[in-house]
From Swiss-Prot:
Name of the protein in question: L-threonine kinase
InterPro entries: GHMP_kinase_N_dom, PduX, Ribosomal_Su5_D2-typ_SF, Ribsml_uS5_D2-typ_fold_subgr
Gene Ontology MF annotations: ATP binding; kinase activity
Keyword Nucleotidyltransferase on entry: no
Cell compartments where the protein resides: Cytoplasm
Chain positions recorded as ATP binding sites: 92-102
Catalytic reactions on record: L-threonine + ATP = O-phospho-L-threonine + ADP + H(+)
EC supergroup of this enzyme: transferase
Known EC number: 2.7.1.177
Induction: The BMC operon and BMC production is induced by growth on 1,2-PD vitamin B12 medium.
Organism encoding this protein: Salmonella typhimurium (strain LT2 / SGSC1412 / ATCC 700720)
């Protein structure tokens, strides 16, 4: 799901794309603080940056990122008045799919390119967390990431191939509202489980074992039920067993759920039928079949 631009070659435009995430593979108290590993999927925010006055209806966080990038290279702040940011994205907003991270990360890379610079992933992550908690979709590899301050960035080996049937709920939750919840005590209580999940993520990537990745994600999803419970969760776990799926993952600060599978091996039509039969579609009326992809922002 990519947004396409019709700019002619030679136009003075910088275009960058960043993927969405189907929630997180894992999120919780790991190595002394709350951290996450995002689950990048093939649904993208595309951002074009040109030399022109700003659009009236620009996204405020993308404009804030332009200002951060200018400040990073010590350019005059008023240059922002001659930089236009055009965001094209159909990623669902406020549901745990990293729509905001995709927007601001792509904006940062496109703006940097427009100014004649490039951004390494560490600097990009630091710029993003200076605006809001950030998903690890900004990294090419699956990465354990401290999404609040970017202090921890531990990359994994390439993961095994995974598809996800993403269950989209009409329920929205802003990331900043999740972060206002009193949650540290519950996070710490699940720290042993999350350490196990993190170990399984690393093992899954080293051994190319999708079942291990599903096991890791399911452990984290179960732990998340004490913080932000998903409706029909027990029925979803039963469905994973019944259809012999790899596991499930959730948005720990949102409402989406991902059923982890192989579209060549698992019967998607049967799975969707089971969702309806178990009345789970009342909670997740929309489903999207996506694949997990490499993360990172790419210039077009």
């Amino acid at each position: 799901m990519r947004a396409h631009y019709s700019y002619l070659k030679g136009d003075n435009v910088a275009v960058a794309q960043c993927p969405a995430s189907c929630g997180e593979l894992i999120q919780g108290w790991i190595l002394g603080s709350e951290k996450l590993v995002s689950c990048p999927v093939d649904w993208y925010s595309t951002v074009a940056v040109t030399a022109a006055p700003p659009l009236i209806n620009e996204r405020p966080l993308s404009r804030a990122m332009v200002e951060r990038v200018l400040a990073h290279w010590q350019y005059p702040a008023h240059w922002s008045n001659e930089i236009r940011v055009d965001v094209r994205s159909s990623i669902p907003v406020a549901k745990g799919m990293a729509s905001s991270t995709a927007d601001i990360a792509a904006t940062a890379v496109a703006t940097a390119h427009h100014l004649g610079h490039s951004l390494d992933e560490t600097t990009l992550a630091q710029l993003c967390v200076s605006i809001e908690p950030t998903d690890s979709t900004v990294f090419h590899q699956l990465t354990l990431f401290d999404h609040n301050n970017a202090a921890t960035q531990i990359a994994c080996e390439p993961p095994p191939p995974i598809d996800l049937l993403v269950l989209e709920s009409p329920v929205t939750l802003r990331t900043q509202d999740y972060h206002r919840l009193p949650r540290q005590q519950k996070l710490i209580a699940s720290s042993a489980t999350l350490q196990q999940a993190w170990n399984l993520v690393q093992e899954a990537c080293i051994t190319q074992n999708p079942l291990r990745l599903g096991e890791a994600a399911t452990l984290s999803a179960i732990a998340s039920q004490t913080l932000l419970p998903k409706p029909g969760f027990t029925a979803l776990l039963s469905l994973v067993e019944e259809c012999d799926l790899y596991g499930l993952n959730v948005a720990h600060s949102g409402s989406v759920v991902g059923l982890m599978l192989d579209r060549k091996r698992h019967d998607i039509a049967r799975l969707k039928g089971k969702l309806a039969e178990k009345k789970l579609t009342r909670h997740w009326p929309k489903q999207h079949l996506l694949k997990m992809v490499t993360g990172g922002v790419k210039l077009q």
